[in-house]
Curated annotation (Swiss-Prot):
This is Macrolide export ATP-binding/permease protein MacB. GO terms for biological process: response to antibiotic. It is found in: Cell inner membrane. It comes from the Bacteria. Homodimer. Belongs to the ABC transporter superfamily. Macrolide exporter (TC 3.A.1.122) family. It is a multi-pass membrane protein. PROSITE patterns: ABC_TRANSPORTER_1 (PS00211), ABC_TRANSPORTER_2 (PS50893), MACB (PS51267). ATP binds at residues 38-45. PANTHER family: ABC TRANSPORTER PERMEASE YTRF (PTHR30572:SF4), MEMBRANE COMPONENT OF TRANSPORTER-RELATED (PTHR30572). It comes from Chlorobaculum tepidum (strain ATCC 49652 / DSM 12025 / NBRC 103806 / TLS).
Length: 651
């Protein structure tokens, strides 16, 4: 069954080297019970590790069931260990966070097979007399009971080979004999047992005793009454490993990952806290940015689309500005001439502004008075939500009618309907015909603190102005803004006899550019806020990586155990990645809840415009998962790269 020829193994310790095995050759038949003895440093444990496929020889041949295994890959050896061998260790190597039955089931996770593993585990526990303690943790059991659990674990895959490394080394005489009784029974059932011990009385339970010294076999004797009851191979050495991402396999890894996470609650919480804060910051910051953007979009709608603003320039005498309109003064005829430009212009409205004192009964309010034309309502999204807009006749007749902004309406009328009420504007009676839609603030200015009246009424009855303060022009399309600007510029220069190089007499402002600038600014602020929050996510990810590296160091023996019972490199890496992603995802989910809560509080108590978007939730969640993958990769690779024998020896 087992044949090794001229096997050598040398360990390097600093600059010196120690030859643990020096040309060892031996054959072990199927169904034998072999004890390997020797003093400390004799090479017996090294031989056991090579026979158990936990280590590979430097030179020589190792044939197991007729197949050369000494040059197989790590994953191939893992498959054979899982399918053919069972291990019993001196230190038991039970996982303290798992119950007895879960410890026994552990090798089945890496088998790639399906079945009622817990039922099989209970049978194995019953064989060793511990079925009634299947739900206990290792720390609730004696040393002898823990070793019996380890034997049950070694038997769960029904292996042909049992490797027992000092199985009684940490037990008293009574428990030692109990363990040896179990091993003897297994031998009678046909198992091939290879045991390392330094105790002569324990070695006497075996049918064959191999003694080693200084890396060579010095004695190999069999009992006269040795009996072989070989177990027939059940499927040979073919590993039953399945695809790494098989659903049942992944589920087992996920369950174990969260068991590991839950076993260190405080440390896990502190690790997750960084991700939690990062995700909550991303959600809250992006909610602020999205809310600001939505608020800005509402304000931009109130400004109208494809809009040009034509204003008189300011003359300069001795470098001093003389004020707007001192050079070029626009009249209603200028507005009409602009309206007549063919194929480019949709709407035009003259505009005059001033201040006014409004009075209704015992209430008064100082506000801005804006005289506008018929088309202004459509151009600037000012059509009343309550009441109506001016008619052309009212503008021609200089009618004393007014449309109130929502702030003015609230100050004068509260919740009452102001339509058809009579108010005074600068001591002149006006009839309220409507309330304009709310526009909000544009910077520090309240756009709803205004009263609209016909431009003719404002000029000749209220403000006493002979000229327009400006002209608003709505261009037919965004593509026509440039040609419309050129046409208006040429028209004004012609009408007012201005030189081609005169840049001070008037200006044409493209409100679309202003809108784009505001949108770009808002977008930049949103990105800046999101970037700042993302930094905290990265810092949280570094914290996760640090904890995972510590976890790899602390769990080195566990990693060695998992590899000994059949875990491949990919299995180890995947489990640690799942743990890392599990922590970041948990932090991400809690962070989403906290972030949304903070956003709601900012909106409710600070009055800030916030809007939580699904995009920010998906982004934060996805980013937290990526953080877990990225920062968990190094610890996972480090864990996967550990050699089984080195990991099991780790102190």
């Amino acid at each position: 069954m087992i044949e090794i020829v001229n096997v050598t193994k040398t360990y390097r310790i600093g600059e010196s080297s120690v030859k643990a095995l020096d040309g060892v050759s031996l054959t072990i038949g199927q169904g034998e019970f072999v004890a390997i003895m020797g003093a400390s440093g004799s090479g017996k444990s090294t031989l056991m590790h090579i026979l158990g496929l936990l280590d590979v020889p430097d030179t020589g041949q190792y044939r197991l069931m007729g197949k050369e295994v000494s040059r197989m890959s790590d994953d191939e050896l893992a498959g054979i260990r899982n399918n053919v061998a069972g291990f019993v260790f001196q230190q038991f190597h039970l996982l303290s966070r798992m119950s007895t039955i879960d410890n026994v089931v552990l090798p089945c996770i890496y088998s790639g097979q399906r079945g009622d593993f817990r039922k099989d585990a209970l049978k194995r526990l019953e064989m060793v007399g511990l079925a009634q303690r299947s739900d206990h943790r290792p720390n609730q059991m004696s040393g002898g009971e823990q070793q019996r659990v380890a034997i049950a674990r070694a038997l769960i895959r029904d292996p042909m080979l049992i490797f027992a490394d000092e199985p009684t080394g940490n037990l008293d005489t009574k428990n030692s004999h109990e363990i040896m009784r179990i091993l003897t029974d297994l031998h009678r059932q046909g198992k091939t047992i290879i045991m390392v011990t330094h105790e002569t009385d324990i070695a006497e339970f075996a049918d064959r005793v191999i003694t080693m010294k200084d890396g060579v076999v010095v004695d190999d004797r069999k009992k006269q009454d040795a009996r072989l009851n070989p177990q027939m191979p059940q499927g040979g050495m073919e590993a039953a490993h399945s695809a790494l991402f098989q659903p049942s396999r992944l589920l087992g890894f996920v369950v174990q990952a969260f068991q590991s996470i839950a076993s260190n609650k405080i440390r896990t919480f502190l690790s997750v806290l960084g991700i939690l804060v990062g995700v909550a910051s991303v959600i809250a910051m992006m909610a602020l940015g999205t809310g600001a953007k939505a608020s800005m979009e509402e304000q931009l709608k109130s400004m109208g689309s494809n809009l040009l603003s034509v204003r008189g320039g300011s003359a300069k005498i001795g470098g001093a500005s003389q004020g707007f309109g001192t050079v070029t003064r626009f009249t209603e005829k200028d507005a009409a001439a602009i309206q007549a430009i063919p194929n480019l212009i949709d709407h035009v409205s003259g505009d005059v502004t001033g201040s006014g004192q409004l009075v209704y009964l015992d209430k008064n309010w100082s506000t801005s008075v804006e005289g506008v034309d018929y088309d202004y309502g459509e151009m600037r999204a000012a059509i009343p939500t309550v009441g109506r807009w001016f008619t052309r006749e009212e503008i021609q007749e200089r009618a004393k009618v007014a449309i109130l902004g929502t702030t003015v309406a609230m100050q004068l009328f509260g919740d009452a309907d102001p339509v058809d009420k009579i108010i005074k504007i600068n001591r002149i009676n006006f009839r309220v015909i409507g309330v304009a839609p709310a526009k909000g603030f544009a910077g520090p200015r309240d756009q709803d603190d205004v009263v609209y009246i016909p431009v003719s009424t404002a000029m000749y009855r209220v403000l006493g102005k002979l000229y327009l303060d400006g002209i608003y022009v709505e261009v037919s399309s965004a593509e026509n803004i440039a040609p419309a600007t050129q046409a208006i510029d040429a028209l004004i220069r012609k009408r007012h006899k201005l030189a081609a190089d005169d840049q001070d007499s008037f200006n044409i402002r493209d409100m679309t550019q202003f809108q784009q600038m505001l949108s770009a600014t808002t977008q930049t602020m949103s990105m800046l806020l999101g970037s700042i929050a993302a930094i905290s996510l990265v810092v949280g990810g570094i914290g996760i990586m640090n904890i995972m590296l510590v976890s790899v160091t602390e769990r080195t023996r566990e990693i060695g155990l998992r590899k000994a019972i059949g875990a491949r490199k990919g299995d180890i890496m995947l489990q640690f990645l799942i743990e890392s992603v599990g922590m970041t995802l948990s932090g991400g989910i809690i962070g989403i809840v906290v972030g949304v809560g903070v956003s709601v509080m900012l909106s409710a108590f600070a009055g800030w415009a916030v809007k939580t978007s699904m995009f920010s939730v998906v982004l934060a969640t996805g980013f937290s998962v990526l953080i877990g993958l990225f920062f968990g990769l190094w610890p996972a690779r480090k864990a996967a790269a550990l050699k089984p024998v080195e990991a099991l020896r780790y102190e």
